[in-house]
């Protein structure tokens, strides 16, 4: 998930001596974070360009803010190029922030299908902008797996060209 990438980024920035705070986009308020030296938004896009639930209200707050904060902003979009609205929410966040005059920390970029390599490439660019060596070695946490034993199997519908199987484990 995007939160896993955020945890990797938080850990790497902390190890590089940076002060870091991570929160869901729904909790982000530009006025409350006025003292931040920089802001980094990791934004996933779902379905037809929809925002994740954790981003509720973010665009409204960005659109209502007066000129952008002094802290430069980086937006990294997460999505799947197999969908027509690839990273559309992240692009919208980027566009609204730039329209408000928010300075760019690093150019807008995207990560396709949770690619650790693309994330690491973006991390090197971010590190260069910050003047630090930043190695983002993201290792996704795999879900727990369980071995199942097949007890029985019943097949139906093959003669009607609608095969169905009932499996009992």
Explain the meaning of each model-derived region.
Residues 1-169:
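FNR-like FAD-binding dehydrogenase module
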């Amino acid at each position: 998930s995007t939160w896993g990438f955020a945890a990797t980024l938080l850990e790497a920035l902390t190890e590089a001596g940076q002060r870091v705070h991570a929160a869901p986009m729904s909790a982000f308020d530009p006025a409350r974070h006025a003292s931040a030296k920089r802001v980094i938004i990791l934004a996933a896009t779902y379905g037809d360009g929809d925002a994740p639930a954790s981003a509720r209200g973010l665009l409204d707050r960005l659109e209502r803010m007066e000129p952008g904060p002094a802290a430069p902003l980086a937006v990294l979009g997460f999505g799947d190029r197999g969908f027509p609205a690839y990273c559309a929410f992240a692009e919208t966040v980027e566009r609204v922030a730039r329209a408000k005059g928010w300075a760019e920390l690093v150019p807008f970029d995207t990560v396709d299908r949770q690619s650790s390599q693309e994330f690491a490439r973006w991390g090197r660019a971010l590190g260069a902008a910050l003047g630090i060596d930043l190695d983002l070695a993201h290792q996704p946490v795999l879900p727990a797996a369980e071995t199942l034993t097949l007890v029985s199997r019943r097949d139906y519908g093959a003669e009607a060209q609608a095969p169905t199987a009932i499996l009992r484990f």
